[in-house]
């Protein structure tokens, strides 16, 4: 059973809090509800995107630095 984490805003997807920092999550990581998965930058504001369920990251659907639209699937989480 999988759930999708979708972008709530239009912006630029980032996997880490800073350029040389480790990514928030990788495929296979266990995550908890409310845990930060990525950042979507919109109008110079960094918006943390959190998991809406406990589970395991099964897929990262976009690449670092990619522009995402509202509703773009960012992650798939296996429950």
Functional labels for PLM-detected ranges:
Residues 1-79:
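Structured functional modules or segments
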């Amino acid at each position: 059973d999988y759930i999708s984490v979708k972008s709530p805003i239009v912006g630029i997807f980032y996997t880490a809090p800073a350029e040389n920092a480790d990514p928030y999550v990788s495929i296979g990581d266990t995550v908890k509800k409310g845990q930060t998965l990525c950042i979507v930058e919109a109008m110079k504001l960094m918006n943390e995107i959190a998991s809406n369920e406990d589970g395991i990251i099964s897929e990262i659907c976009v690449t670092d630095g990619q522009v995402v639209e509202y509703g773009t699937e960012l992650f798939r989480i296996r429950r």
